[in-house]
Design a protein with these regions (language model features):
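Cleavable N-terminal export/targeting peptides
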Residues: 1-33
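Short loop/turn motifs that connect adjacent beta-strands in outer-membrane beta-barrel proteins
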Residues: 25-38, 69-88, 130-138, 187-195, ...
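N-terminal ordered "arm"
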Residues: 33-77
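Transmembrane beta-strand segments that form the barrel wall of outer-membrane beta-barrel proteins
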Residues: 40-49, 75-79, 193-203, 277
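Residues on the lipid-exposed face of transmembrane beta-strands in outer-membrane beta-barrel proteins
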Residues: 43, 61-67, 94, 122-128, ...
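Residues that define the transmembrane beta-barrel architecture of outer-membrane proteins
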Residues: 55-61, 88, 116-120, 137, ...
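Long, hydrophobic/aromatic-enriched structural stretches that serve as scaffold segments
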Residues: 83-153
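Outer membrane beta-barrel transmembrane domains
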Residues: 102-105, 222-290
Length: 290
């Protein structure tokens, strides 16, 4: 028999596409910040095909839309900005994550493996960039479900010729409510070189974590610190880059401490899942590099 293992909840890597389309005015907000009038549609796709495995975090997909009108509600207005003169982007997104065991075809529960889990989240977020201090503050409010309601098993059935039977043992339905805040500060900004540090905290019934990281870029980098670029020269966010073709290499490393992870430990309210991982068997500290 296998020895009892330890389980980690590792933030997933993303492949993101950022097609954008811009307008030409910049309305002012209260508190001397600004709302970007540019709009973006973002596709994030994560799959274990990139790592050559088919277990644990096995698939994730997210659709995001950024528009200035999403800032016209109470929740968005309550999210903090990076400071006086900050440029704010408001958006909504929907995300689904899938987690499977190392043997998805197993017909019995293996207490030494991780549980199957599906996550479905809707999100309102605000990305606030203070260019004068090269500071970016991102805040997210997330609401969703873990369990069969996430439709993870249904989607994987459509995608796989052989359906993983282990979904019958997935973590049961429960409500997820999460807050996430991250801050990134650029410390080196040269013509072809960037270095920044970041810190991230999550609190809620899905993930409760704290982490920090370092990020590096080198190449033909965009001139500004903005997380988004636009080709519309009639907006203040237009960079007027010295090169038509931008390219860069990047590297990053970080450490995360996990206090709670519903995809391993089960939902906070529904404690009837057939398999969960006890707290003492969790690896709390995760170190990542890319």
């Amino acid at each position: 028999p296998r020895k009892a293992g330890r389980f980690i909840a590792q933030p997933e890597d993303s492949l993101a596409l950022y097609p954008g389309f811009g307008q030409m005015i910049l309305p002012a907000e209260p508190a001397e910040t600004f709302t970007s009038i540019n709009s973006y549609f973002i596709i994030d796709f994560d799959n274990d095909i990139f790592t050559g495995k088919d277990y644990y975090f096995t698939n994730g997909a997210q659709l995001s839309l950024i528009r200035p009108s999403f800032g016209n509600n109470l929740i968005a207005r309550l999210l903090p900005s990076a400071g006086k003169g900050a440029m704010n982007h408001y958006g909504i997104s929907i995300r689904q994550n899938m987690y499977t065991s190392t043997n998805p075809e197993q017909t019995e529960i293996d207490v030494n493996d991780r549980p199957f889990a599906g996550i479905l989240l809707a999100e309102l977020f605000k990305i606030s960039t203070l260019h004068s201090r090269e500071l970016c503050l991102t805040n997210r409010v997330q609401v969703g479900f873990i369990g069969e309601t996430s439709l993870a098993a249904f989607i994987q059935r459509l995608a796989h010729h052989l359906f993983p039977v282990g979904w019958q043992f997935q973590i049961h339905d429960d409500l997820l409510v999460n807050l996430e805040s991250s801050i990134e500060k650029q410390v080196i900004s040269e013509r072809n070189l960037r270095l920044s540090f970041s810190a991230t905290g999550r609190l809620g019934t899905y993930l409760t974590t704290a982490g920090a990281g370092i990020h590096f870029k080198a190449g033909r980098i965009p001139l500004s610190f903005s997380p988004f670029a636009t080709i519309n020269s009639k907006t203040v966010e237009y960079e007027g880059n010295r090169h038509k073709l931008l390219w860069w290499v990047f590297g990053e490393a970080g450490e995360t401490y996990t206090f709670y992870n519903a995809s391993l430990q089960g939902g906070l309210f529904n404690r009837n899942s057939p398999l969960v991982i006890e707290r003492r068997r969790l690896t709390r500290i995760v170190i990542q590099a890319a």
